[in-house]
Each structure stands twice: as structure tokens, then as C-alpha cells.
């Protein structure tokens, strides 16, 4: 079995033990790579590649084949069902800052990164893009609440802030 896997959800909580009742130690963002260390019922014990966190996730929302080309550069990027900036095509789903995606198709000001999932081009940049002004990045998170183990617009902690 191949041991490099990638998150296919906006983000997944990484639990200390194989239970939703246990403490969240970190989060895995869309496109983030991890290794499976152990399978336990409906849970995987994993180690994240970026920051080496170890914990448990449910056995869903992952893929083996993924080669990211771009990343999210805004606090959150709205996912559209179709490449049109109309209310009826907007979903209530977002990708958080630093998520990694693969651009599959471009249409006007939109890119497709998964089947029937589109992002506005203003929300992405090439995978190797480095923002030089860290203060601007930190200001993106200024009104985000504190969440232990968080790395997203829904809540962030001190280590999550340093990792972005």
C-alpha cells in the first residue's frame, strides 16, 4: 500500500485518540500530505508531512494521487458549483488559506480544481508563491477566534498561526 495520502476535504480535524470526544491536536488542510501509520476500525493513525503531527482521522476524504499546482492565498476561498459569480452557483463551502489544489481547467475568471468545484482566480497563486509581507498574512486572521489545534478561518491557535 502506498503511504502518501492527501486531504480531499476543506479541512479535517486531527484527533489525539480515535474518537470525536478526544482533543483536536491540529487540522489537515485540503491538499495537505500525510502518511498512514496504523488502521484502527474506522480511523487512521497518521503523521502529517508538513509539521509531523501524529493523530487520528476518520477513514474518509483522502486521495492517493495528487500533484498540487496552486494554493489558496486569501483567508477563505468560496467554492462555486459552476464558473459563474452568481448567487445560485455559490456553495456554502470554502477552502482555507494555504490549502493546496491542482488546477484542472480554466474558464474566464474561474478555475476548476475538482469535479463541479470551481474557485475564483483571485483566491489562488502558484504553489511556490511566497508572500513577502508576513504582516499582511497575519492580518488575514485578525478577527478569527481562538481554537485549540486550529489552522483555518473557523479558528486558529498559536502553532497554526506560525505554520501558515
Which residue stretches match the model-derived regions?
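Active-site nucleophilic cysteine motif
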Residues: 138, 150-164
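Basic/aromatic DNA-contact patch characteristic of tyrosine site-specific recombinases
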Residues: 16
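Boundary regions of SH3-family modules and the immediately adjacent low-complexity/disordered segments
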Residues: 1-3, 19, 23-26, 30-79, ...
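Helix-biased detector of long, well-ordered alpha-helical tracts
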Residues: 145-149
